[in-house]
């Protein structure tokens, strides 16, 4: 008796007989909804205020764990209050105190945060990292959170003015690399940013001015009413008046935050590269990393804005009166208008790097009347040189602040 055996090719072999099959293409399309909260509150470190406890999931019963990363200077000022707060809410906190200055904004700091997360054994979805500090530390911790197991929840508590109106309200994270500012980074939203003006009471005047640069930016490109309010109140703006959060100061800060969020929300991942919030951020990265002694971020932005005001005046986007008002406000905020290393050559270097970042076009935002902006792609080296001379001539006439 003989048996006949028939062997049939498997379905898998047939379907994926690659040499004989035509080309195969799969297309995947997905969406990831993102939502986060920016909340202005008072007395954040008072145990009677549940905002921070709620942000980390603490309910007054023991067991809630969190990693709290604190700026070294902030820890000296508020470390006891922070620890007392979490003790009152019976949270089990692991503490990491780190420097928060621009010179240490590097990948090594990101690794240090992820190492602390690993040693703590933080859970990927239900235990949070809290960063308490300025813009530099928020960028570092945000980047660490975005990379750790490809994303761990985190909470921001900005303690500087620039952190409260700018760095703390968007989704960018990043560190400096080589001679380039924020060359490495990610987009990663916090669950919540908690803003308490009380932290500003201990911020030095220079750092208040640092944050004012970002507020002036929003006024120039988006909010003429904010610009007029700043003209009226800039002489009164201080760490104490901001911390007291009277009606005018509250409006200044809240308008700046609302304006920033209004610009960011429809373009959170920068799919559109014409961004009005890039105003003051075309030439400033090159200046910020080359100045010696170092400039604060807002100081470099101020010098950049002054040149952009001059460029706009040269193109008659701004009247002479408007240009002078803009420069006068920047100077009145205690910010520089010029800097010795800010040469025509450096302007060209900065613009060339911005063109690479903006995918081959300048996409340079310029004010088109106070409170409005346009984008240009044809600024020349000669224009840059004239703009620099315009600002220098203005400072010579007015004895405005150079550097």
Question: Where in this protein do the model-derived segments appear?
Answer:
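Active-site segments that bind and position negatively charged phosphate/pyrophosphate groups
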Residues: 229-345
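Non-catalytic interfacial helical region
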Residues: 114-132, 141-156
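Short glycine/serine/threonine-rich phosphate/pyrophosphate-binding segments
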Residues: 136-143, 164-165, 286
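A glycine/threonine-rich phosphate-anchoring loop and its flanking beta-alpha core
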Residues: 143-236
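C-terminal charged capping/lid subdomain of soluble metabolic enzymes
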Residues: 3, 7-17, 22-25, 31, ...
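Solvent-exposed alpha-helices and their adjacent loops that cap or buttress functional pockets
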Residues: 30, 60-61, 121-124, 147-149, ...
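ATP/NTP phosphate-donor binding region
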Residues: 3-127
């Amino acid at each position: 008796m003989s048996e006949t055996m028939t062997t049939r090719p498997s379905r898998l072999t047939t379907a994926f007989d690659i040499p004989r099959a035509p080309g195969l293409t799969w297309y995947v399309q997905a969406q990831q909804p993102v939502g986060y909260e920016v909340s202005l509150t008072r007395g954040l470190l008072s145990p009677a205020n549940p905002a921070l406890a709620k942000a980390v999931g603490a309910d007054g019963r023991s067991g809630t764990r969190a990693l709290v990363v604190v700026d070294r200077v902030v820890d000296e000022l508020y470390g006891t209050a922070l620890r007392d707060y979490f003790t009152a809410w019976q949270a089990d906190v692991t503490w990491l105190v780190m420097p928060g200055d621009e010179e240490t904004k590097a990948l090594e700091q990101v690794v240090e945060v992820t190492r602390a997360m690993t040693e703590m054994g933080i859970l990927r979805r239900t235990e949070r990292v809290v960063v308490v500090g300025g813009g530099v530390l928020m960028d570092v911790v945000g980047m660490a959170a975005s990379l750790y197991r490809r994303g761990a929840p985190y909470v921001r508590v900005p303690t500087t003015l620039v952190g409260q109106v700018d760095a703390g309200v968007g989704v960018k994270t990043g560190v400096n690399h080589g001679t380039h500012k924020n060359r490495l980074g990610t987009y990663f939203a916090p669950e919540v940013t908690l803003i308490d003006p009380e932290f500003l009471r201990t911020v030095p005047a220079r750092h208040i001015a640092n944050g004012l640069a970002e507020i002036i930016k929003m006024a120039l490109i988006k909010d003429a009413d904010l610009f007029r309010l700043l003209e009226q109140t800039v002489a009164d703006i201080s760490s104490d008046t901001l911390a007291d959060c009277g009606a005018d100061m509250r409006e200044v800060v809240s308008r700046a935050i609302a304006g920033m969020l209004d610009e960011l929300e429809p373009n959170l991942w920068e799919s559109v590269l014409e961004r009005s919030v890039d105003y003051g951020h075309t030439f400033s990265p090159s200046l910020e990393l080359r100045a010696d002694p170092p400039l604060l971020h807002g100081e470099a932005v101020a010098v950049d804005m002054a040149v952009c005001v001059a460029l706009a005046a040269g193109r008659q986007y701004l009247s002479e009166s408007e240009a002078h008002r803009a420069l006068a406000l920047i100077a009145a905020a205690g910010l520089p208008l010029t800097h010795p290393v800010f040469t025509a050559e450096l302007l060209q270097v900065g613009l060339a790097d911005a063109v690479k970042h903006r995918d081959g076009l300048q996409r340079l935002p310029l004010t088109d009347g106070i409170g409005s902006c346009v984008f240009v792609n044809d600024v020349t080296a000669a224009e840059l040189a004239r703009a620099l001379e315009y600002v220098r001539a203005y400072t010579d006439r007015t004895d405005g602040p150079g550097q």
